[in-house]
Amino acid sequence: AVPAYNTTPGRDKYHPRHRDNGYILTFDGLRVYIAGDTEDIPEMKDLKDIDIAFLPVNQPYTMTVPQAAKAAKMFSPKILYPYHYGDTKIGELKDALKGSGIDVRIRELQ
């Protein structure tokens, strides 16, 4: 398990440290990181060889677009799927990660 928590002052009430987890699943040779509800926490620097990552982008509960970009750059997954983004201008995440080598895939809700 990987910790999942808020670091921004005032938001720790949503996801306090030492309560929630994210997970790395390995199957068919792929390492998939599902972050859970979290922000760009320092523990993400320790993630290695992540093929696919799922990161939450939704205020006020999880990451801003800049936080999600920072988080992704910490461990450089091959593919990134943002989730929980609701009305967030999620296209800005693609722009923020342009040139990083991270393939940002956005699934539009229908």
Segments and roles (model prediction):
Residues 55-58, 77:
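A broad detector of the eukaryotic-type serine/threonine protein kinase catalytic domain
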Residues 48-54:
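Active-site metal-binding motif and surrounding structural segment of the metallo-beta-lactamase
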Residues 37, 53, 80:
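Divalent metal-coordination and catalytic microenvironments
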Residues 4, 55, 82:
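Redox-cofactor binding/interface segments in oxidoreductases and associated redox assembly factors
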Residues 7-9, 39-43, 60-65, 82-91:
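Active-site environment of divalent metal-dependent phosphoester hydrolases
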Residues 67-69, 73-110:
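Binuclear metal-ion centers of metallo-dependent hydrolases, dominated by the metallo-beta-lactamase
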Residues 23-25, 32-34, 61, 85-88, ...:
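Broad hydrophobic/π-residue packing in well-ordered secondary structure
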Residues 1-48, 107-110:
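Core dinuclear metal-dependent hydrolase active-site scaffold
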